[in-house]
A protein has these predicted regions:
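Extended recognition/assembly regions associated with phosphoester-bond processing machinery
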Residues: 1-168
Length: 168
């Protein structure tokens, strides 16, 4: 099953053809678009980023409160997370990213967190639940990644427990 979203959404089981799972989907959010939609244009940039991050955190918290406690909950996010380690792609990124707080991706009500945007493979919640994983990019963006191993993830997700296998 594949579903593409262009704005933050909470996808419940009935919207996923009855699949026994719930997904909070956070696609790449452009700062300028989000600022305009939240009527924050012209504000101090530091204040704007803080407000955007707070509003996104509140949105996710509200969706978690509305979730079915009996079904697994997955968070997918194309975003940076505070504390994540960047690979060589950092050199090609311009501007300040919208940054998610670590507490958001380590929330125990989540069963798996699938992250994209940062190319360095890493689990931001190593040894704890939920796994919060950047598998890295399967494509190299420049010669700085020529010797980097590339991975994908197999995740067996059940409510309260997720088994993750890194595949090269």
């Amino acid at each position: 099953h594949v579903q593409v979203v262009n704005k933050p959404q909470f996808l419940k089981s009935d919207g996923l053809e009855g699949l026994p799972v719930q997904i909070i989907a956070l696609p790449w959010v452009s700062r300028s678009g989000l600022m305009a939609s939240l009527e924050l244009s012209g504000e101090d940039p530091g204040k704007v980023y803080e407000e955007l991050e707070n509003r996104l955190s509140d949105l996710v918290k509200n969706w978690l409160d509305d979730a079915d406690p009996n079904l697994p909950m997955i968070l997918t996010a194309h975003a940076s997370v505070e504390g994540a380690k960047y690979g060589s792609e950092r050199m090609v990124m311009l501007g300040k990213d919208l940054v998610l707080p670590p507490a958001l991706v380590k929330n125990k009500r989540l069963d798996y967190v699938a992250l994209g945007h940062i190319h360095k493979p890493q689990n931001l919640n190593e040894g704890s639940h939920p796994p919060a994983i950047y598998p890295g990019s399967i494509e190299r963006v420049d010669f700085g990644e020529i010797n980097d191993k590339k991975y994908y993830i197999l995740a067996e997700i059940t409510k309260g427990k997720t088994d993750v296998t890194w595949k090269e």
